[in-house]
Amino acid sequence: MRAIISVLLISAMVFSIIEAVPLEEGLQLFEAERVGCLPRNRFCNALSGPRCCSGLRCKELSIWASKCL
């Protein structure tokens, strides 16, 4: 019984998080990231993918993370 209640609560939380950003707004944000440059403190890829805006460089912070700084 506890497992069923836990699954229902987790499902409700996931659904509320997904619905927090409307689909159209999410698509606009995604398109802006794909086409434009990345602002400060956004994750980047030094070898491929979106580039940092002018004046910023893609700095490797760890093996798994690089940010525009």
From Swiss-Prot:
Signal peptide: 1-20
Domain of life: Eukaryota
NADP is among the record's keywords: no
Main location group: secreted
Compartment list: Secreted
Tissue expr: Expressed by the venom gland.
Intrachain disulfide bonds: 37-53, 44-58, 52-68
GO cellular component, one term: extracellular region
Family of the protein in this entry: Belongs to the neurotoxin 01 (U2-agtx) family.
Recorded domain comment: The presence of a 'disulfide through disulfide knot' structurally defines this protein as a knottin.
Protein name according to UniProt: U2-agatoxin-Ao1e
Organism annotation: Agelena orientalis
